Amino acid sequence: MLNFSDRLIESIKKKNSVLIAGIDTSIENIPDYFIKRFYDKEKSEIDNLKTILFEYIRRIIDAVEENVVGVKFQAAFFEQYSYHGFEVLHKLCEYTKNKKLVVIFDGKRNDISSSAKGYSNAYLGETPVFGKKMRFFEFDAITTNPYLGQDGIKPFVEDCERFKKGLFVLVKTSNPSSADFQDLMVEDKYLFEVVAEKVYEWGKNCIGKEGYSDVGAVVGATQPEAAKRIREILPNSFFLVPGIGVQGGKIEDLKYFVDSNNMGIIVNSSRDIIYAYKNYVHSDFEKSSYLASKNIKESINAAIS
């Protein structure tokens, strides 16, 4: 199997796109007409929830698949529905994988030692069960929080190497309060630069044939100045870039995120795609999501070409 970074590049070239569709879906934001279409009074509220959530997201994925290289599932929007949400997530992960799209679990997981290994087993690797190894999810990559240091990252990196998976470590995030910690000075460097240096170290042993590491960084689209500094530290790492659109990130600033080959980024768009029907005059949410993803893809390509 190819390394994660090589598979990602292969998909980028095939689709002529670096766009990732972010799935941050809550049941209350699904159109009423769609809920009425699938709501069955003979079923429980939980069964209706699972059916409607799956059917809506499945149709979003179908609508945008030609314009995106992958799908990023935000864990919180499934965890809010307890294990019922994770049943839906499991089905959607398999569904998306069958479409040959890159599948990212955005859970920002982290812990130490065996706890971190448990997270990595679940989402990247294998879990021991009665003397056998079982896979419960088939994600291609996961987001992680580096706050606990190497102890919390090592199990994920080891599974990236073993199973050809990917890792995106939070380095400089798009939220307004990211500066509270990430912009603190450590001697003569910002803390986010120190973290970027660690990301480089963690990823130097899992380099694909195309020369990119399977360990990348999350760098928010609202942080172009920081992105320049991080790119100097991580010349051969992919940046997962959230925050365009609603969060205030500008597509034209993406030129500061790419590497010297105008590569090295995948750009997430969530609400502008999954709730695009709110911005179009017609009520066809599938067509709206398709048009939104097409427009965003083309705008990104123009900005980084």
Swiss-Prot record:
NCBIfam families: pyrF_sub2
Native source species: Caldicellulosiruptor bescii (strain ATCC BAA-1888 / DSM 6725 / KCTC 15123 / Z-1320)
Pathway annotation from the record: Pyrimidine metabolism; UMP biosynthesis via de novo pathway; UMP from orotate: step 2/2
Stretches of the chain forming a coiled coil according to its record: none
Gene3D superfamilies: Aldolase class I
Record-annotated active site: 108
EC number annotated for this UniProt entry: 4.1.1.23
Sorted UniProt keywords: Decarboxylase, Lyase, Pyrimidine biosynthesis
Protein name from the UniProt record: Orotidine 5'-phosphate decarboxylase
Reaction equations catalysed: orotidine 5'-phosphate + H(+) = UMP + CO2
One Pfam family linked to the record: OMPdecase
Example of a GO MF term: orotidine-5'-phosphate decarboxylase activity
